[in-house]
């Protein structure tokens, strides 16, 4: 299990992981790593939250929120934000399904993708600022948001098909079973309940699950399935929805 965790941490983040810690794990077994997603999210969110707490006293809430969101993006290499931008460029192009998928493969940033990045990043900064003004624990909120968003991404993998012939998303999409999905969601729920007691965290997770499930169905209808880009979009939007649900 530890080898699987380190392999997943290296796969979906840019955090330094000694190669020997994940050596010997076949790429075809990576789908089993879905159950580690909430734990990885917990780690990323905690680091981002610590950055916020350290900077808040020095430069104020808005700038602390800005840098915490920036650090979160840097730790993932902008991987999920890139998926969000590509998904919006493709889906909102109003072209045929095949053309949408081609646009999503294009490395150039389009208008819809640019707008999505601006709105999502700005919304996160504003929500974190508002949560601070309301006295919510930011470290716990960010840790829970990142754990839940990565856990609920399993809803776009279970019983979904991969929309392309090949790609990184094919490692997970359509490859995880019901037990893995339940364990992943269960871990995310436990983290949310422990970090944000009083059912506040669990209620926010339920809202996030509903939103991501609906997103998955809409993308399935539009694209004929899911891709690595849509998983990234789901994670980014899941973080935002969870934080909004805490207001």
Swiss-Prot record:
<feature type="transmembrane region" description="Helical">
    <location>
        <begin position="113"/>
        <end position="133"/>
    </location>
</feature>
<dbReference type="GO" id="GO:0008818">
    <property type="term" value="F:cobalamin 5'-phosphate synthase activity"/>
</dbReference>
<keyword id="KW-1133">Transmembrane helix</keyword>
<feature type="transmembrane region" description="Helical">
    <location>
        <begin position="34"/>
        <end position="54"/>
    </location>
</feature>
<feature type="transmembrane region" description="Helical">
    <location>
        <begin position="138"/>
        <end position="158"/>
    </location>
</feature>
<feature type="transmembrane region" description="Helical">
    <location>
        <begin position="59"/>
        <end position="79"/>
    </location>
</feature>
<keyword id="KW-1003">Cell membrane</keyword>
<comment type="pathway">
    <text>Cofactor biosynthesis; adenosylcobalamin biosynthesis; adenosylcobalamin from cob(II)yrinate a,c-diamide: step 7/7.</text>
</comment>
<dbReference type="Pfam" id="PF02654">
    <property type="entry name" value="CobS"/>
</dbReference>
<keyword id="KW-0997">Cell inner membrane</keyword>
<dbReference type="GO" id="GO:0005886">
    <property type="term" value="C:plasma membrane"/>
</dbReference>
<comment type="similarity">
    <text>Belongs to the CobS family.</text>
</comment>
<keyword id="KW-0808">Transferase</keyword>
<dbReference type="GO" id="GO:0051073">
    <property type="term" value="F:adenosylcobinamide-GDP ribazoletransferase activity"/>
</dbReference>
<protein>
    <recommendedName>
        <fullName>Adenosylcobinamide-GDP ribazoletransferase</fullName>
        <ecNumber>2.7.8.26</ecNumber>
    </recommendedName>
</protein>
<dbReference type="GO" id="GO:0009236">
    <property type="term" value="P:cobalamin biosynthetic process"/>
</dbReference>
<keyword id="KW-0812">Transmembrane</keyword>
<keyword id="KW-0472">Membrane</keyword>
<comment type="function">
    <text>Joins adenosylcobinamide-GDP and alpha-ribazole to generate adenosylcobalamin (Ado-cobalamin). Also synthesizes adenosylcobalamin 5'-phosphate from adenosylcobinamide-GDP and alpha-ribazole 5'-phosphate.</text>
</comment>
<keyword id="KW-0460">Magnesium</keyword>
<keyword id="KW-0169">Cobalamin biosynthesis</keyword>
<dbReference type="InterPro" id="IPR003805">
    <property type="entry name" value="CobS"/>
</dbReference>
<feature type="transmembrane region" description="Helical">
    <location>
        <begin position="194"/>
        <end position="214"/>
    </location>
</feature>
């Amino acid at each position: 299990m530890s080898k699987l965790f380190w392999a997943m941490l290296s796969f979906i983040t840019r955090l330094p992981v000694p190669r020997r810690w994940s050596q010997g794990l076949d790429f075809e077994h990576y789908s089993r790593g879905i159950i580690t997603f909430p734990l990885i999210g917990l780690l990323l969110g905690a680091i981002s939250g610590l950055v916020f707490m350290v900077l808040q006293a020095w430069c104020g809430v808005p700038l602390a929120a800005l840098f915490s969101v920036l650090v979160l993006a840097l730790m993932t290499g902008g991987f999920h934000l890139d998926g969000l931008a590509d998904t919006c460029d493709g889906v909102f192009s109003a072209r045929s399904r095949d053309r949408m998928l081609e646009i999503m493969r294009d490395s150039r940033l389009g208008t819809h993708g640019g707008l999505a990045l601006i709105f999502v990043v700005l919304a996160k900064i504003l929500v974190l600022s508002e949560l601070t003004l309301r006295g919510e624990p930011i470290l716990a909120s960010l840790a829970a948001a990142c754990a839940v968003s990565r856990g609920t991404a399993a809803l776009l993998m279970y019983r979904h098909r991969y929309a392309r012939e090949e790609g990184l998303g094919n490692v997970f999409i359509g490859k995880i079973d019901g037990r893995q999905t339940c364990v992943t969601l269960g871990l995310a729920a436990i983290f949310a309940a422990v970090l944000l007691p009083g059912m506040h965290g669990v209620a926010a997770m339920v809202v996030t699950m509903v939103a991501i499930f609906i997103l998955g169905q809409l993308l399935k209808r539009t694209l004929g399935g899911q891709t690595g880009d849509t998983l990234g979009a789901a994670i980014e939007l899941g973080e935002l929805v969870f934080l909004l649900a805490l207001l």
